[in-house]
């Protein structure tokens, strides 16, 4: 009986040692990852709105509160990190006017961006008879009459960072790019096809992660 008790005690002691050894190894791995992360100090991706081709931008209704628009934009993203990759798990692009969304979101396919890599996307963003707030409808009509409309091209999504073989959890990504559309002078753009106008911006965007 005594031998059985000693055997059971030794077994429990061995299990405890194995358990704490595993905890210690996991702690060392976690600490190593944190140190690598702190040393590398990942930087946010840099976005530039290169251009926008306007195919349609019409306000209708009485009062004017229905907006139909169709753009194709060119958006570039650069990973400034030397040793950190970026996974874009989701990225939805859309346009806003005075903080109100005026187009449907367009999803960009998930992609991986390596060190110092640059990706360029050219999605279409559009909306058909999108209701806008009455005061925004009046302001939009006025801005068009004055010749210039300021839109904000936004991209919202989620990213993950890759350090070596370690991949972080998901982080929210928010991108805002100002786009001044000059309706009063089409000479500022390039005529594309029958009635589309392409405007070049090379505008740096604000990025938050």
From Swiss-Prot:
Induction: Induced by infection with the cucumber mosaic virus (CMV-Y and CMV-B2 strains).
A Pfam family assignment: LEA_2
Residues carrying covalently attached carbohydrate according to the record: 58
Subcellular locations according to the entry: Cell membrane
Membrane topology annotation: Single-pass membrane protein
TM stretches of this protein: 18-38
Tissue: Expressed in rosette leaves, cauline leaves, stems, and siliques, and at lower levels in roots and flowers.
UniProtKB keywords: Cell membrane, Glycoprotein, Membrane, Plant defense, Transmembrane, Transmembrane helix
GO CC annotation, single: plasma membrane
Any one biological process term the GO annotation gives: defense response to virus
PANTHER family per UniProt: LATE EMBRYOGENESIS ABUNDANT (LEA) HYDROXYPROLINE-RICH GLYCOPROTEIN FAMILY PROTEIN-RELATED (PTHR31415:SF176), OS05G0367900 PROTEIN (PTHR31415)
Function of the protein: May play a role in plant immunity.
The protein's name in its UniProt record: NDR1/HIN1-like protein 1
């Amino acid at each position: 009986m005594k031998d059985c008790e000693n055997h059971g005690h030794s077994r429990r002691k061995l299990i405890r040692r194995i358990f704490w050894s595993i905890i210690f190894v996991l702690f060392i791995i976690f600490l190593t990852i944190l140190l690598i992360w702190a040393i590398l100090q990942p930087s946010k991706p840099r976005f530039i709105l290169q251009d926008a081709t306007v195919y349609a931008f019409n306000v209708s209704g009485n009062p004017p509160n229905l907006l139909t628009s169709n753009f194709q934009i060119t958006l570039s993203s650069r990973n400034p990190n030397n040793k950190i990759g970026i996974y874009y798990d989701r990225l939805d692009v859309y346009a806003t006017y005075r903080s109100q969304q005026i187009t449907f979101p367009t999803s960009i396919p998930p992609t991986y961006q390596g060190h110092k890599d640059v990706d360029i996307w050219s999605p279409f963003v559009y909306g058909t008879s999108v209701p806008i707030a009455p005061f925004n409808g009046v302001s939009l009509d006025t801005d068009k009459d004055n010749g210039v409309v300021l839109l904000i091209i936004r991209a919202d999504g989620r990213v993950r960072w890759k350090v070596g073989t370690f991949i972080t959890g998901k982080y929210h990504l928010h991108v805002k790019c100002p786009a001044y559309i000059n309706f009063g002078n089409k000479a500022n753009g390039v005529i594309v096809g029958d009635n589309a106008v392409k405007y070049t911006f090379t505008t740096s965007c604000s990025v938050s992660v």
